[in-house]
Amino acid sequence: MATPTFDLADIKRRMQGAVNSLKHDLGSLRTGRASPTLLDPIQVEAYGAAMPMAQVATISVPEPRLLSVAVWDRGMVSAVEKAIRESDLGLNPMTEGQTIRLRIPEMNEQRRKEMVKVAHKYAEEARVAVRHVRRDGLDLLKKLEKDGAISQDDEKRQADQVQKVTDQHIAEVDQTLAAKEKEIMQV
């Protein structure tokens, strides 16, 4: 059996993965502004399978509060329209030929606060994921030190580096959350 080795780059990569996942999740939150990522969670019944919206149409933002969905296949327009109506985004599609226009309504104060709570939940999940990666790294260091593969000083030095990387990624999560919260609360 191969002896496990400590790889700080792998820990950084896994922590960055948690941050990237948060950014993706926050991108799909409605803010009152039009964004093509708003439609990312919507799956369209196409050709006998559920497909992401981006695989059946081009999504653009002609105005700050308007999304334009240009469906590639004329026969798919009704399926795309149905998927948008049935999503929990509360959007009302207006169809003009192969183009579906989606007006993004302004959010009221209560809805904004609900979105901020969801954003905080996503951020906390990202923090927990980063901390799990830290724990995995620290556990591996302790095991390597216990097995005699590294010295106690090396274990301490590497543990300090893991903590520093953790702090950087937690700070990035907090900055990302603050920016999204500001965007959501902007009227």
UniProtKB/Swiss-Prot annotation:
It comes from the Bacteria. It is found in: Cytoplasm. The keyword Protein biosynthesis applies. One of its GO terms (molecular function) is ribosomal large subunit binding. SUPFAM superfamilies: Ribosome recycling factor, RRF (SSF55194). Its main location: cytoplasm. Signal peptide: none annotated. GO terms for cellular component: cytosol. Gene3D superfamilies: 3.30.1360.40, Ribosome-recycling factor. Keywords: Cytoplasm, Protein biosynthesis. Belongs to the RRF family. Responsible for the release of ribosomes from messenger RNA at the termination of protein biosynthesis. May increase the efficiency of translation by recycling ribosomes from one round of translation to another. This is Ribosome-recycling factor.
